[in-house]
């Protein structure tokens, strides 16, 4: 009996302890109502290094007969000075034709001073509504009196003034989120395809009848909620947040045309969407606008081959019209006005390119795409909002060109890197042919490095290097140089090695797209760790393979290298008189289990020189996160082999 009693007491005690230690369950609160504990909080308990965190983000969405409304209330905790950037808020929306509108904005800062809660409201006159372009607007405001420890909150109403509109919802942000909740009242007049892109389980996921009046069921009430969501962090070789952030999406697939009608499917095909766009005067109408530039067209027509004409027109447009840094799949000003102003968005610039190619007798076609940051196209979701740019497609003999003249570093003979490994919507307006086409580059992007150096007895490596960059490596090098300037770019080539000094740097073939960018470098490196007896050096120079990008134990996103890549690193190092080779790395090969990546190292001695050859080849550009363990293990071994030292001993 005493044993049974003891067991009973132990069980009760265990339940009591669990009840005492169980983490509190947080939800949303009314505007202005706040727990003192949130004001006194100094860190995020599930992400200690966070600068700010979302305490809660709640949306209540209700569908009506002709419009949808969303009431949103968001509260953020500022944890330190770096988190104060969250106090500047921008809400963008699609305002054309009155499709969307933001109203009833309310915002305030909450502080605690000697246990007294203080509220500082944002002056309504300092809440600005501005036009971004003729299609989009934004609401902007900044919170006053913000300091570490402050809580800021805002609420607003978003109205979608079109039948069946429904906003998507992001559970995850670039700062941690303690609680995120979407409540939706959806009338039975509408049917949506609900697409969850989450890997963390919901804390709440319910469906209940939506009842109005005494017993009138008009639809369903849904709740989706998640708690303690870690901040979204960019991972090496990942596409944009749009592909990887945890969210839920809604696509209207059916609705009733009358109060007592039957539900009809309305999901449009890609062909129907494309056809409607081509027939739209603001889009398709611009394809037939004729831009006058007799000099450009005459010069293009004087060239012998179509290939030369394509190259000339592409570079002329690229170098004449400045991109305003906006990737859009619509036109704001129209091609004639953009050509006059010499500045426009991505689609406007490429429509100008399309126009001139047509005038020069080159058959070409518009093609919608989504850029890397905008997110990959989900082919089963027939929604034009997945696209954010238009490019020009040209077929010349056996070669396909995808031309984007908005980026000044793009070339006519390489597919735009920003569009690789996703599908575009190809359009042939004349034949009413509209189809999805997947874009990938089968040709490897190559980088070839030659190092010729002499090892000095005093522990210094001195010599020259030549780097030949092909395709996307060429484009990336030109972009980095143009963005950083020569001094910072040469620092980049040093890969944070303070013992490496670049004495001179020269470039060749910067203006010729068909030739590799050649970089000639004279350098000197102090071989630290060397002493009176031994010299140690690592031949992994100017390779861009100094730091392993895949050290994390887990991976949340697909690895997308963009292109398949090939690297060849060759070195010849002269051994100083009075020294002998004490230790050389062995010649070895490494291969991924599926043979998608190979690494080969050959090290040998020849006539008093050390010859080093590294070869890295990729057979594919995409690796799913399920393949990450294999990638991580391969890279760990490869970097160990790349960074293995050569040892010389004094005779």
Specify the residue positions occupied by each region the protein language model found.
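A carboxyl-terminal module marker
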Residues: 492-651
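Acidic low-complexity segments
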Residues: 237-323, 331-332
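Bacterial Sec-dependent N-terminal signal peptides
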Residues: 1-25, 651
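Active-site neighborhood of thiol-dependent amide/isopeptide-bond enzymes
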Residues: 135, 297-395, 412
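Beta-strand-rich, non-transmembrane domain signature
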Residues: 20-275, 292, 351-354, 364-517, ...
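Hydrophobic alpha-helix feature that most strongly marks membrane-spanning transmembrane helices
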Residues: 318, 322, 358, 457, ...
């Amino acid at each position: 009996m005493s044993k049974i009693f003891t067991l009973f007491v132990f069980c009760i005690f265990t339940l009591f302890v669990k009840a005492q230690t169980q983490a509190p369950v947080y939800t949303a609160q009314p505007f202005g109502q706040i727990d003192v504990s949130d004001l006194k909080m100094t860190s995020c308990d599930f992400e200690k290094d966070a600068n700010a965190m979302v305490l809660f983000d709640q949306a209540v969405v209700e569908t009506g007969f002709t419009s949808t409304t969303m009431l949103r209330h968001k509260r953020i905790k500022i944890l330190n000075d770096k988190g104060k950037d969250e106090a500047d808020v921008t809400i963008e929306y699609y305002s054309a034709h009155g499709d969307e509108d933001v109203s009833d904005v309310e915002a305030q800062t909450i502080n605690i001073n000697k246990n007294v809660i203080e509220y500082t409201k944002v002056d309504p006159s300092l809440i600005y509504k501005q036009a971004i372009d003729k299609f989009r607007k934004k609401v902007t405001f900044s919170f006053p009196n913000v300091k570490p420890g402050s809580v800021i909150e805002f609420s607003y109403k978003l109205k979608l003034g079109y039948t069946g509109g429904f906003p998507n919802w992001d559970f995850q942000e670039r700062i941690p989120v303690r609680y995120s909740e979407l409540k939706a009242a959806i009338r039975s007049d509408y049917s949506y395809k609900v697409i969850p892109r989450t890997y963390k389980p919901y804390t709440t996921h319910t469906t209940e009848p939506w009842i109005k009046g005494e017993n009138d069921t008009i639809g369903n009430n849904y709740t989706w909620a998640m708690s303690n969501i870690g901040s979204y962090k960019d991972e090496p070789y990942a596409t944009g947040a749009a592909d990887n952030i945890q969210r839920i999406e809604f696509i209207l697939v059916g609705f009733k045309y009358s109060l007592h009608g039957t539900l009809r499917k309305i999901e449009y095909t890609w062909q129907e969407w494309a056809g409607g766009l081509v027939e739209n005067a603001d889009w398709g109408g611009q394809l037939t606008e004729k831009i006058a530039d007799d000099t450009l067209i005459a010069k293009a027509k004087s060239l012998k081959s179509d290939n030369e004409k394509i190259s000339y027109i592409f570079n002329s447009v690229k170098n004449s019209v400045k991109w305003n840094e906006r990737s859009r799949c619509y036109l704001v000003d129209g091609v004639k006005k953009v050509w006059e102003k010499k500045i426009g968005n991505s689609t406007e610039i490429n429509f100008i390119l399309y126009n001139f190619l047509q005038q020069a007798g080159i058959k070409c076609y518009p093609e919608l795409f989504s850029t890397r940051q905008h997110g990959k196209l989900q082919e089963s979701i027939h929604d034009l909002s997945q696209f954010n740019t238009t490019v020009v497609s040209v077929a010349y003999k056996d070669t396909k060109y995808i031309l984007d003249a908005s980026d000044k570093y793009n070339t006519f003979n390489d597919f735009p890197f920003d569009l690789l490994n996703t599908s575009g919507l190809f359009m042939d307006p004349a034949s009413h042919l509209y189809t999805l086409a997947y874009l990938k580059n089968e040709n490897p992007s190559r980088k070839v490095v030659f190092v010729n150096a002499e090892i000095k007895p005093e522990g210094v490596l001195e010599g020259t290097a030549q780097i030949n960059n092909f395709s996307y490596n060429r484009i990336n090098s030109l972009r980095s140089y143009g963005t950083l300037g020569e001094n910072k770019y040469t620092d980049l080539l040093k890969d944070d090695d303070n013992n490496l000094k670049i004495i001179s740097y020269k470039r060749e073939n910067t203006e010729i797209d068909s030739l590799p960018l050649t970089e000639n470098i004279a350098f000197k490196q102090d071989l630290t760790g060397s002493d009176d007896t031994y010299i140690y050096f690592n031949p992994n120079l100017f390779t861009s393979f100094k730091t392993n990008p895949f050290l994390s134990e887990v991976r949340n996103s697909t690895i997308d290298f963009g292109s398949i890549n090939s690297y060849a690193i060759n070195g010849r190092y002269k051994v100083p008189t009075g020294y002998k080779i004490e230790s050389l790395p062995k010649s070895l090969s490494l291969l991924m289990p599926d043979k998608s990546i190979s690494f080969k190292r050959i090290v040998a001695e020849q006539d008093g020189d050390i010859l080093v050859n590294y070869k890295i080849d990729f057979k594919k550009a995409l690796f799913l996160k399920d393949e990450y363990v294999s990638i991580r293990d391969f890279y760990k071994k490869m970097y160990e082999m790349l960074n293995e030292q050569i040892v010389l001993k004094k005779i």
